[in-house]
Structure formats: structure tokens, C-alpha cells
């Protein structure tokens, strides 16, 4: 998974054609708060496919496993 972002959004690219964009806030000390309730649909061309709660949980778990002291720390709220 590739994770990219701006000061107010984060994109989770599953590297299989599926991408999910979420809203959030970049904080000080290399932290980013991700608003889970904004994780509602895939980016085009898959925007018509539903994303399940399990799919969201898998994205969160994978992202948390990728964290290290060298990366931005993600907090899902």
C-alpha cells in the first residue's frame, strides 16, 4: 500500500487499482488524524463499488503496520 497526503487529505492506494481518499488534519510532531467517517467510497474508476466496514478496517490495520519512527503517525478517529 502507498500512502500519500496533503495537509487535509490522505490517500490509501492499495496498488491494485483501488484508492481511498479520506479527510483529516496534519498535526505537529509528524502526526496525521484521519477521520474514519470520511472513508466512504473508492476513488474513480471504482466509485460505484461499495466499501465495507471490513475493507476499511483492513486499510487501517495495514496502514498501522507500516508505521515506523521515520514515518508520519496516523490516528484514526
Description of each model-found segment:
Residues 31-77:
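Acidic, low-complexity intrinsically disordered segments
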Residues 1-27:
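Amphipathic, interaction-prone secondary-structure segments
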Amino acid at each position: 500500500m502507498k500512502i500519500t497526503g496533503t495537509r487535509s487529505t490522505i490517500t490509501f492506494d492499495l496498488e491494485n487499482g483501488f484508492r481511498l481518499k479520506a479527510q483529516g488534519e496534519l498535526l505537529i510532531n509528524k502526526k496525521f488524524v484521519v477521520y474514519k467517517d470520511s472513508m466512504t467510497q473508492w476513488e474513480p474508476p471504482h466509485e460505484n463499488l461499495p466499501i465495507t466496514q471490513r475493507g476499511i478496517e483492513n486499510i487501517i490495520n495495514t496502514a498501522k503496520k507500516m508505521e515506523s519512527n521515520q514515518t508520519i503517525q496516523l490516528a484514526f478517529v
